[in-house]
UniProtKB/Swiss-Prot annotation:
Protein name: Adenylosuccinate synthetase
Organism: Phaeodactylum tricornutum (strain CCAP 1055/1)
Catalytic site: 103 (proton acceptor), 131 (proton donor)
Alphabetical GO biological process terms: 'de novo' AMP biosynthetic process; IMP metabolic process
Subunit structure of this chain's protein: Homodimer.
């Protein structure tokens, strides 16, 4: 836990810097001394041996430094990115991200964590995202709102990186209010967030239909076309509604542009404008400069939680392009979609389903058939694998370690939230995809080529399953032995602490190992 609090201004950091500096200086001095005493006739072997010895000495010094700053040199070196207020209080922005292809269970962890946070934020995507939260047997479905809205003491921020379809957003608020949740005065929208219009959604559907069997598999929520308008610099932002004449002029121009670009597209401009004029006051009452607000909340020492949407493998840059979303659901979106600096980030929590699922098209190396009586059917049926947004049946497969390592490399996860472990109950065996092979050779990195990724072989490790119900387990040691072995093996393969373990669908069905659980304490009760 000391590492999480480790500050650049601390004595340990200064001492550590001196230790590293001394080790490097010693290495340089020794190298110079050995060089000056050698001759052209000296063989290379003694020189190589001396370099090895020097490197070993440097390694020992670095290990000593690790012990100094971390307390336990055998523990997993968690990142220390928390900031310190003038009063000495440590704080930072924590992030929950999807580590696979989405639908990992991010919303549940956000709901669990958000009870202790002051601000919950969304930073990317739009109503194509979907989170389902179960509280006291009651289901709440979120698409644009952060799941943290269920915490009555938290304010919710929709950042500038999100694209917002106002009708869907207002319907979501009305549905929430009808469920007895009071959101008034707690939901803020960035004035810089771009708008999704109905014609964006129609264009989205047309583009998918035009692609035929090569379709991307989008949700047809207009996300891609809205981001296209943003990049083309002709889009409208939420803040534009604060100046009606400006909004009306720009909206008419955008409609004309789309009607000229898409044959047969007809937009009822006057009807659309009438709707936005009706809701403008309501939207404007929630519209603020969220960049200024969020940073001021940070400086005031407020705890901030970012809820990621979609997932890394759907990232426009890092995902299985072109079968991706149109935004960056990886860690970079927190900076660009909320307007905060990197030094303000603290915990980066990767949410990983115990098996893989995917909605839509694209490569899926560990995919299983969903035929009756197969492991794939078990995962699909027991896991209720149907999209929150689309209702489509999700594709299912075994956990994919190469994909997970790639995701961890990009995001720098400090802890893992392993969800839906309970779905494995009743399976005689479970598998973990350990490595990719292509043309008989192991791949050392995630291939960018879809042709390669679609044709990789997967090397699996088979572990025994379990039959016991784990939904009532509250501690790690209460889990069946085979379940524990599975979790520990995944942790070992990833090299990242698994802090949270999902054992059921309800809000409380989570084992939290606590912040101090690292690789050195695996298998012990914290």
């Amino acid at each position: 836990m000391f590492r999480h609090a480790f500050s650049k201004s601390s004595p340990a950091f200064l001492a550590g810097g001196s230790a590293i500096g001394g080790a490097i200086a010693g290495l340089m001095w020794s190298g110079e001394r050995n060089t000056s005493s050698s001759t052209a006739c000296d063989s290379s072997e003694p020189s190589n041996q001396s370099v090895i010895g020097l490197l070993q000495e440097l390694s020992r010094k670095v290990n000593n430094l690790e012990s100094l700053v971390g307390g336990n040199p055998g523990s997993f070196p968690a990142r220390s990115t928390s900031s310190v207020t003038k009063s000495g209080t440590q704080y930072g922005i924590d992030i929950v991200l999807g580590a696979q292809w989405g639908d990992e269970g991010k919303g549940k962890l956000v709901d669990l964590l958000s009870q202790d946070y002051d601000v919950c934020a969304r930073v990317a995507g739009g109503s194509n995202a979907g989170h389902t939260i179960v509280v006291q047997g009651k289901k709440y479905k979120f698409h644009l709102l952060p799941s943290g809205v269920l915490n009555p003491n938290a304010t919710c921020v929709i950042g500038n990186g999100v694209v917002i379809h106002i009708p869907s957003f207002l319907n979501e608020l009305d549905s929430l209010e009808a469920s007895g949740v009071d959101y008034q005065g707690r939901v803020y929208i960035s004035d810089r967030a771009h708008l999704v219009f109905d014609f964006h959604q129609e264009v989205d559907g047309r583009q998918e239909d035009r692609l035929g069997r090569h379709k991307i598999g989008t949700t047809k929520k207009g996300i891609g076309p809205a981001y296209s308008s943003k990049i083309n610099r002709n889009g409208l932002r939420v803040g534009d509604l604060q100046n009606w004449d400006h909004f009306e002029r720009r909206f008419r121009e955008l409609c004309t542009h789309h009607e000229r670009s898409y044959e047969g597209l007809k937009i009822d401009v006057d009807n659309q404008l009438a709707f936005y004029k009706t809701v403008a006051e309501r939207v404007n009452s929630m519209t603020i400069d969220t960049i200024d607000y969020t940073n001021k909340q940070f400086e005031a020492g407020k705890r901030i939680l970012v809820e990621g949407a979609n997932a890394t493998m759907l990232d426009i840059d890092f995902g299985t392009y072109p079968y991706v979303t149109s935004s960056n659901p990886s860690v970079g979106s927190v900076l660009t979609g909320l307007g905060v600096s990197p030094g303000k980030l603290r915990g980066i929590y990767g949410t990983v389903k115990a098996y893989c699922t995917r909605v839509g098209e694209g490569p899926f190396p560990t995919e299983l058939p969903l035929d009756e009586g197969t492991p794939g059917e078990h995962l699909s049926q027991v896991g209720a694998e149907y999209g929150t947004t689309t209702g489509r049946t999700r594709r299912c497969g075994w956990l994919d370690i190469p994909q997970m390592k790639y995701s961890a490399l990009i995001n720098g996860f400090t802890s893992i939230n392993l969800t839906k472990v309970d779905v494995f109950t009743g399976m005689p065996e479970v598998k973990i995809g350990k490595a990719y092979l292509h043309n008989g050779k192991y791949l050392s990195s995630m291939p960018a080529s879809l042709d390669v990724l679609s044709n990789v072989g997967v090397e699996y490790e088979v572990l025994p399953g379990w039959s016991e119900d784990i939904s009532n387990c509250k501690k790690f040691e209460e889990l069946p032995e085979n379940c524990q072995k599975y979790i520990l093996r995944v942790q070992e393969l990833l090299g990242i602490p698994i802090r949270w373990i999902g054992v059921g669908p309800n809000r409380a069905d989570v084992i939290d190992r606590g912040e101090g659980w690292d690789l050195a304490t695996a298998g012990t009760n914290q």
